[in-house]
Amino acid sequence: AFLVYQLEEYSTMLKPGSTAVPKMYAVDQGMVYAVSRANQQDIGKRLETAIFCELQRRTSGRRTETITSYTMPTSKQEKVDFLIGDALAAEPYGLIQVCANMGNEKTRAREIGSLQAVMQRTNVDSGLILTLNEGETIELPDSTGTFHVLPSWKWSLYEA
């Protein structure tokens, strides 16, 4: 019965030390569309919100599947949209990046670079990039991991 959800930054500290502004996700996309200006109809943000709502549905009530975001503590500030893991054991096991369109080379390099950096930092061996309609599998050099690029509609149809 929440209208807006707040997504905290991943931290292994008992006391949250992040000064980052948490991400906010509105459950009712129709309301967001109605009250936002025409130039703020960002498809990427709307896709990210839809993915968040599906993750909330899949993980509700489970301690071992906490959803957070993650920003690398480096000068590049590489970000992953969703990090899923065990809250008490501080063990991340899933990384999800959301991108509406990976057709632009700069966007593709940014999304893959961020996901690869966080995968190495968190010791997660696979990552997921959800798009509007693109799909492929990307093997990292030296068998360090795999990216799966999936259309978000197909991912939403998979069982949790």
Descriptions of predicted regions:
Residues 1-92:
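Accessory nucleic acid-recognition modules appended to NTPase machines
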Residues 60-62, 88, 116-124:
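Arginine/glycine-rich "motif VI" loop of SF2 helicases in the C-terminal RecA-like domain
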Residues 78-80, 110-116:
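A short, acidic, amphipathic alpha-helical segment used as a generic capping/interface helix at domain edges
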Residues 89, 101-104, 134-136:
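Short Gly/Pro-enriched loop/turn and capping motifs at secondary-structure junctions
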Residues 92-96, 126:
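Structural motif
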Residues 97-103, 108-111:
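Terminal-proximal interaction/regulatory segments of ATP-powered molecular machines
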Residues 125-131:
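Short, hydrophobic beta-strand segments that form beta-sheet elements in well-ordered domains
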Residues 132-160:
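Domain-level recognition of nuclease-like catalytic cores that cleave nucleotide substrates
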